[in-house]
């Protein structure tokens, strides 16, 4: 089995992986073919907007949902010994569960309202219009410290068209997200006739 430290601390920041994925898909003319999903430490509407600006169109929430339902972050989910009954099948421990579905409904309602408010502040009405718009991200130099002032975010925040040194005219027409349905050219395959 892998060491416990690998289980607990392995991984990469979603910002880095998401930015690289977006740029690679755009450079290869494939961005309009898939929907990119991100998860990991998404808690607030600002987190959702930040991930969308970097290229995500779908979002996974895990820990936030557990906390809304009463999780105390005991890190015992995999042991079937959750003391508040969120992640256990033990009837005695499940009796401690105090969560309600309405708590999750409220969480997502407030999340959606917050995302709408931030979209309005950015001047957009549709969420899909901000997907992959790294040009809207501004670096706040006042937040830098002595150790962080030399960080260069240009490669992280560039759009895919300019991620490699080629004129934009050499790139196929791309969209930052799925603009329409996918076309797999399977309308006339033999299976359609055999199954019908």
Regions found by a protein language model. Give the residues of each.
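Terminal amphipathic helices with adjacent charged low-complexity linkers/tails
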Residues: 1, 124-185
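Glycine-rich phosphate/ribose-binding loops and adjacent secondary-structure elements
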Residues: 1-95, 99
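Non-catalytic terminal/interface segments that mediate subunit docking, oligomerization
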Residues: 1-26, 161-196
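Weak global preference for isoleucine
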Residues: 7, 16, 34, 49, ...
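Glutamate identity and glutamate-enriched acidic tracts
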Residues: 15, 20, 33-35, 58, ...
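Active-site or pore-adjacent capping/gating segments
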Residues: 67-134, 138
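Generic structural signal of hydrophobic/aromatic residues within well-ordered alpha-helices
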Residues: 93, 115, 127, 153-157, ...
